[in-house]
Design a protein with these regions (language model features):
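Active-site-adjacent betaalpha module
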Residues: 1-5, 14, 25, 29-33, ...
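A short alpha/beta connector and helix-capping loop motif
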Residues: 2, 19-46
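Active-site flanking residues adjacent to catalytic metal/cofactor-binding acidic residues
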Residues: 9, 40, 131
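Short acidic, Gly/Ser-rich segments with clustered Asp/Glu that frequently serve as metal-coordination loops
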Residues: 11-18
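Short Asp/Glu-rich motifs
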Residues: 18, 47-50, 139-140
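Short amphipathic alpha-helical segments
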Residues: 19-21, 51-52, 116-118
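A short secondary-structure junction motif
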Residues: 46-59
Length: 160
């Protein structure tokens, strides 16, 4: 833990597989080390590019797939998102709260974790990616490669 704020990205039932199944339990415990906990929850809208271009239809609105795969703290704030990245509203909220650095965990390291880390970085909020609390649905090798890339892009000291 390097901050008093934790961002949990897309740890949802529809993303749990053989590569990510241990993540919910680890994050459920981890969240208790923070004063402020935020979660991002992906929803695949009917007109999304995920459907149109990738023919990917999971995590539709109001389905069990979109539910968080762990018991989140009652005082945590959950933000919906409809793409790989952070919403402008979420970034603005963090800025209004005076948050300048935040620990980041979740899935998938190579997609949403990386994109949101870059969104935070671009908006002058320093992401600290907790490598052992991230995973990729496509496997450990992809997770490791994403961490290598993030070390270069946001700084080696920001991957913990």
């Amino acid at each position: 833990m390097t901050n008093n704020a934790l961002l949990i990205i897309d740890v949802q039932k529809g993303f749990i597989n053989e590569y990510t199944r241990e993540l919910p339990g680890k994050i459920e415990k981890l969240q208790n080390n923070y004063a402020n906990v935020y979660a991002m929850q992906f929803i695949n809208l009917e007109d999304s590019m995920f459907r149109k271009q990738l023919n990917w239809h999971k995590l539709s609105l109001n389905t069990q797939d979109t539910e968080l795969a762990f018991k989140i703290r009652p005082d945590a704030l959950v933000f919906s998102k409809y793409s790989y990245g952070a919403t402008p509203e979420f970034i603005e909220y963090l800025q209004q709260q005076g948050i300048t650095s935040i620990d980041v965990c979740g899935q998938s390291t190579d997609c949403c974790v990386a994109k949101i880390a870059l969104d935070l970085f671009d908006n002058r909020i320093l992401p600290k990616v907790l490598a052992d609390y991230c995973a990729s649905t496509t496997g450990r090798l992809v997770h490791k490669r994403a961490l290598i890339s993030l070390r270069h892009i946001i700084g080696k000291d920001n991957i913990i």
